[in-house]
Structure formats: structure tokens, C-alpha cells
Amino acid sequence: MGFRDICYRKHHKKLKQFQKVEIKVKMDCEGCERRVRKSVEGMKGVSKVTVDPKQSKLTVEGFVQPSKVVHRVMHRTGKKAELWPYVPYEVVPHPYAPGAYDKKAPPGYVRNALADPLVAPLARASSFEVKYTSAFSDDNPNACTIM
């Protein structure tokens, strides 16, 4: 790598992979459905667009980046859009984390608690909480005797 390569280096774009992007967008009517479909049909690299209004789900297949598709849907339609946060019921490991059961989830799906940072992980007691709970225990000989 010489001086010439450093000075005249062109930024090579990373090749995009063919992928299937699933997005959750609330659609109330056929007009919303059409607007969501039209917002991504014109994107470069899109080969197939599928809209499922019952599940509020938009599926885009092609050589696209998921973040750019979500941004385009939000910008063109003015609707809140996010990557599909649900996974099939059989895929989630047991025991289920709190927040995995989402009432808005389609039948047969639960929220992907492992990939979703908004869902709280299992609650753990901090060191202070452990000290306070053991301080008033009957099993502890050094516990408070006033109570």
C-alpha cells in the first residue's frame, strides 16, 4: 500500500446481501396499506413487497439494509415503524422473561425478549436488598432482636 493508494483511495461500498426485512407498521385502512407499499416499492434493490394488514406487517425482500427500509417507511408515510419484534412461540426458551407476553402480538407469536432492549431482563436482587432481607430473618443469629 503506497502513497498513491492512500491519496486516491476510493470508498468501496460493502456489497449488500439479499435478505428479508420484516417491519411492524400500524395500518388501519386500505389507503394506509397502499401508502406503505408504495413507500418502499421504489427503493433501489427491492425485489418483492408483501403487506399483511391483519398483523400490521410489511415484508420487503431484496438487496436492502433494514435500517434504511425502516427510515424510508417512517419518512414517507409519517407512521411509526420498527423491525418485527416478534418470534414464533416455539422459538423462545423457557422460562419466558417478563414482558415477553405482549397483548398486541399476533396469535402464535411472542415478543423476542432476547433481542429487545426495551423488555426488562429477569429481576435480580441487589446486594443491599439481600442484606436488608437477611437482617430481619429468623434464621440469622445476628438479626435484629427488637422485632
UniProtKB/Swiss-Prot annotation:
One of its GO terms (cellular component) is plasma membrane. Residues 18-82 form the HMA domain. It is found in: Membrane. The modification Cysteine methyl ester is found at residue 144. The keyword Ribosomal protein does not apply. InterPro entries: HMA_dom (IPR006121), HMA_dom_sf (IPR036163). SUPFAM superfamilies: HMA, heavy metal-associated domain. This is Heavy metal-associated isoprenylated plant protein 27. It comes from Arabidopsis thaliana (Mouse-ear cress). The lineage of its organism: Eukaryota, Viridiplantae, Streptophyta, Embryophyta, Tracheophyta.
